[in-house]
Amino acid sequence: MPKEHKKRGRREDQKKRKRDHDDESASKRFRKDDIEHVQAENPLQHVANDAPRQDAAPFYGMLDEQEQEYFKKADEMLELNQFESPEDRRIFLASVWKEAEGKELKMATSQTSRLLERLILLASEDQLKSLFQKFSGHFLNLVQNRFASHCCETLFIQAAPAVSQENASVKTEALNTPPASDPDEIIVSMENLFLYTLGELEGNIGFLMTEKYASHVLRVLLVILSGEPLEKQGKSVTQSKKKEKVTISGAGDERILEKRVVPESFLEALEKVISDSVSGIEAHYLRSLAIHPLGGPTLQLLLKLELSHFGKSRAKDEKSIIHRLLPDNPIAEGTESAILINGLVYDSVGSHLLETIIEHAPGKLFKQIYGEFFKERMGSLARNEIAGYVVGKILERLGKDDLEEAMRQIVDQIPSLVERNRTAPIKTLIERCVAREVDCSPIKAQLETAYAGPHGFEVTRILKLNEDDGKPRARHGESNEKVHGSLLAQTMMTVDGPLGQLVFDSLANLSPELSIQLARDGTASRTLQAALVSRNATVIFRRKMIQQFYGKIGELALDPKASHVVDAIWYGTVGLAFIRERIAEELAENENSLRESQVGRKVWKNWQMDLYKRRRNDWVAQARTTAGNEVFQSFPDESQSDVAAPARTHRASRHMSAIELARQKFAAAKAAQAKDGKKPKKGNNPTNGSGETPRSLVAQ
């Protein structure tokens, strides 16, 4: 009897596995189970079906082995950047560009893209335009490629400033440029190149928002169109956290865009992109996009640009993103808007969108959201790891009366927040109370109790200093807790009053050993640096604190972390010229070891020790001028110390003019005369530039 005809088992199994794999990949596009239904009906998916997918992308060819070897060596040379002269590097770059001619697409879509990124970083405006034109017509495929997407991102960032430069300078000869050597070359402005690129992506924006590689490039392009500054890589929503940072040794290659003036065509294109990105998408799918790991950050950026560039009145436009997300007026429990807000508060992705809404929403809308969902819940929300950041954004928009009410709720939760090491809401609360002139006494009382030790308030508990026992720790987790603790301590010191004095007193009472440990700790030392240059630090505190390091300055100057504390001591010795000279003497005693160390050489330079060694009198005169011509004042009244010590920051170390010094000394003399009931005695000290005699130096 004939058997039923069947296909071979292995081929059928392979097809079945392929179908299962495709289904599984599709279901992973959204991370929430309730969004799986979106895959079948989401309009974004229909757009994606029409767009070129990665498995159907054109193949641009491969480099042969000889070309790969050449480009690999060129990449290594550019990474090291050890050319004898700029001219040598220019010649080398010209030869690499010549070798890459006609191979740009092959390089961009392979591992050689690293070299192409470095070439873009060092390219001239003409070279950027040429590469733009080589990529033209292929951008839709390139932005979806694992390697080429990074090249596109770098190209956009490097080319963006040229748009503003072209528009700033009126070039009447722009259209009359002599023909280039290449008859096929098209002369076009950088502005039009960006617009042509956007035209290629038009109709696919919805799909690209959730594409693994293209979503990051799309965000960069949106920022460029808006003229907004591009945030640093560590905190930016425009770049992938997994992106390899391609750098050039010794070059200023931080790809940061400052705020720029962009042409009107860019703003028109941006408005069209914002409109096209959500047009035709039902509200249900748009809300699902809010918690998508790739689409969520893109939606945040679109919403931010919509409200900041086209007016908050856009909230009334039914086609706007903010109205599509929150259509109900008023927003009340049970409405679709309420369901969305309650769902975003505790979501790791969606909470960022809620922060954007709170930060940029019109005042009337913000008051509705705050009064309906957050006014009575500020304390409980602050305890949550995710919702705590939403609380921080809310605090930034509250008026004085609402802030006082929110403070009362959050203050009750401070012991719980400290126990859970969630100090970010406390830090923001202190900052806003200072800005709104709200009394911080309740916060001070709770923090003093929460961080109490055998000797009262202990700053080491905030900084987690005693927990460093030399054991290896995870990169994140506890290190983040230390960072947040350090930021809290620094914020407390900005408060002029009992709250800030908690930290200053605790630091001043540390033992010399613990002070050295504090200076050597990479995170905790930032608190010490901030304390030394704080405008609220008294002369008494700075003197006591710096004395803890006597005899150890040479060691600290050689430590990569503690060397920053030594630099801060220079600014911390304003009004303490004798101590500044004492520190310089210790540095001079350790000259050999400092000169042999890269870290030590920086400290030596910052303290101007070459001048100290060669012309000590000039150094002393300059040091005393910047440290205060009144030189060292021993044990001034605590009430006057804040007045006597000028504001000290790393930026504000300017020289005081003669008239300013005269006024300062006259005020100090009058205050002393009023207190003692007699005129100050005149000595034989040399006079300053104002003709007044400074007080004598008091030895320690």
UniProtKB/Swiss-Prot annotation:
Pfam families in the cross-refs: PUF_NOP9 (PF22493)
Source taxon at top rank: Eukaryota
Biased composition (Polar residues): 684-700
Molecular function terms from GO: RNA binding
Protein keywords: Nucleus, Repeat, Ribosome biogenesis, rRNA processing
Biased composition (Basic and acidic residues): 10-39
Signal peptide: none
A GO CC term assigned to this protein in UniProt: preribosome, small subunit precursor
Cellular localization per UniProt: Nucleus, Nucleolus
First and last residues of every Pumilio repeat: 200-239, 336-371, 372-412, 509-547
Region (Disordered): 1-49, 634-655, 667-700
Family the entry assigns: Belongs to the NOP9 family.
Job description of the protein: RNA-binding nucleolar protein required for pre-rRNA processing. Involved in production of 18S rRNA and assembly of small ribosomal subunit.
Name listed for the protein in its UniProt record: Nucleolar protein 9
Organism lineage string: Eukaryota, Fungi, Dikarya, Ascomycota, Pezizomycotina
